[in-house]
UniProtKB/Swiss-Prot annotation:
Belongs to the peptidase C12 family. BAP1 subfamily. Catalytic component of the polycomb repressive deubiquitinase (PR-DUB) complex, at least composed of caly/calypso, Asx and sba (MBD5/6 homolog). The PR-DUB complex associates with nucleosomes to mediate deubiquitination of histone H2AK118ub1 substrates; the association requires the positively charged C-terminal tail of caly, probably due to direct binding of DNA. Interacts (via ULD domain) with Asx (via DEUBAD domain); the interaction produces a stable heterodimer with a composite binding site for ubiquitin. This is Ubiquitin carboxyl-terminal hydrolase calypso. One of its GO terms (cellular component) is PR-DUB complex. Residues 387-462 are annotated as: Positively charged C-terminal tail required for binding nucleosomes. It catalyses: Thiol-dependent hydrolysis of ester, thioester, amide, peptide and isopeptide bonds formed by the C-terminal Gly of ubiquitin (a 76-residue protein attached to proteins as an intracellular targeting signal). The record marks 109 as: Transition state stabilizer.
Amino acid sequence: MSVAGGSISTAAGNAGKNNALPMAQLADGWLELESDPGLFTLLLEDFGCHDVQVEEVYDLQKPIESPYGFIFLFRWIEERRARRKIVETTAEIFVKDEEAISSIFFAQQVVPNSCATHALLSVLLNCNENNLQLGETLGRLKAHTKGMSPENKGLAIGNTPELACAHNSHAMPQARRRLERTGAGVASCRFTGEAFHFVSFVPINGQLFELDGLKPYPMNHGCWEEHEDWTDKFRRVMAERLGIATGEQDIRFNLMAVVPDRRIAITHKLKMLRTNQAIVSGTLQKLLKADEQGERDEQQRPDTPTTLLEPSAFTARDLQSLLKNLDTEIAINEQHLADENDRRQMFKVDASRRTHNYDKFICTFLSMLAHQGVLGELVSQHLLPSKKIANRLNRQTNAATAAANAANTNVAGTNAAGSKSQQQQQQTQQQPQQTQTAKNGKSPGKTPGRRRKGRNKCRKRK
């Protein structure tokens, strides 16, 4: 605890000295952040770590180049079967040895709404310092918390104003209002019945660790095979975790990778390509000049100490083809670098839109419209199209119903007309027969025997 207090005084002293930290922003505590790779990338820059970026992972099977770690966002429900099943599964892999715990950076989340920063720090502060430049703030935090307990490390994170200010600067205005409604002591990712929570997966000393600030201990998933990368082990663990945590039904989760800044690798590759381009271009010019002058002496051949290419092994046509390929590669990488710069710029634009509070503008704009007497008319115009659309849909529905009824009526009329036509045809066929019977002196439809029998009965009655 004393070391954590020292971290506060050191950071606060630097803040007061430089007047760079708006301490009033910390009055409301830590605010809730969205799960967005652009937001996390800019947050790392604000922490002082400029050589890292965060990318969203859409396909677990797709290879990822040199990741420092992964951040998994999932729906946290305190009392559900899947949660109990995960606890039962992960309890067996808890690392409870105090010496092993103190040798890594594992911090318990004791500050509400700080799980996003916890997840990033769990990845960065467990990386090899030779491969990653942490910056002044994170480097000081790592040095101060060395050997601390997980709880004190969590307190040290919450008591570092640089981290808190950077964290809150990326929160939406709705997060502050939500915090005011729920109370400053309620954590959206810890104490509510259903929320979202971040955990980190990092390789430490040849083993895959899962660091969750809401768990009492770090979790060791074991070593990976000699012939595979640590990401292969992570994929297997993640596939199993998704099946348990989501019950193969809930798809509300997010996976992000903390990777080196792509612009650094592209810039390094461009530098190498341009160097090779200059070497090949110079060699080609000297070779063409030698061909023109007819000088083929070995001592006069171009000297290329920085290339492994022997000028005598290539013709001018070969060098021209190689130069063309280099030009193509340079153009492709320049486009990639421009895309990455545009992407980083869009992160900043989205951050400005996300964090800007539009409430005052909207209220002022509506007040001006009401003062000018046009607000009611605009509202009516906005509502009128909706009514027109509803009426149009009703008319279309009624027309479709009437058309269907008319079609059914036509079908019934057609069937009746067909039956009447058949009856007329039958009557037409019977008329010649009746005419022939009349010619023979017999009444159609009457039996002669019955007629005589009836006459005899009449005579008897008389």
